[in-house]
């Protein structure tokens, strides 16, 4: 087996006996793949189809069934003197087992980070994430009440269909 180095990693099924691991490594996203149920892995490579931004952020991957894989994380942007650059929560979709990201959709345009996803029993996609009411999270140590909350989005099962709202 080969070793995958990085932090804040997520793993998802991406087809029969195939797995992908998505890794935050500094400001960038890296991916590695296994074709034998996780016994061996490809060398991790930078995933240019996913956002890179200063400071980076944890993101989530989730199997959508078959070869479909979803990625959810902030797109990011410019920091300000009072706010970080973690905002614009995006959902990316890969019908090719995370080998390329063919569609993306803005889910939440304000402060967002640290999402996690799961498929519900009825096929809907659930996403829980940290959210805030401004463009980026407040960076000062004294923060007002409500500066951050947990939010949940439930997307319909049709989100995995090729043409659904990603066009």
Q: Which residue ranges define each predicted feature?
A:
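Asp-box/BNR beta-propeller blade signature and adjacent active/binding-site loops
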Residues: 1-167
């Amino acid at each position: 087996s080969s070793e995958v180095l990085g932090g804040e990693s997520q793993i998802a099924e991406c087809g029969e006996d195939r797995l992908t691991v998505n890794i935050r490594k500094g400001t960038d996203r890296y991916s590695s793949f296994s074709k034998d149920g996780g016994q061996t892995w490809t060398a991790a490579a930078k995933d240019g189809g996913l956002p890179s931004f200063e400071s980076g952020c944890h993101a989530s991957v989730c199997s959508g069934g078959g070869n479909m894989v979803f990625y959810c994380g902030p797109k990011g942007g410019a920091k300000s003197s009072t706010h970080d650059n973690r905002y614009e929560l995006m959902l990316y979709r890969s019908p090719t087992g995370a080998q390329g990201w063919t569609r993306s959709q803005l889910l939440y345009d304000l402060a967002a980070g640290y999402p996690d996803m799961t498929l519900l029993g009825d096929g809907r996609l659930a996403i829980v994430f940290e959210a805030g009411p401004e463009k980026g999270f407040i960076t000062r140590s004294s923060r007002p009440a409500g500066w951050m909350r947990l939010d949940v989005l439930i997307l319909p099962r049709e989100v995995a269909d090729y043409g659904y709202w990603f066009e």
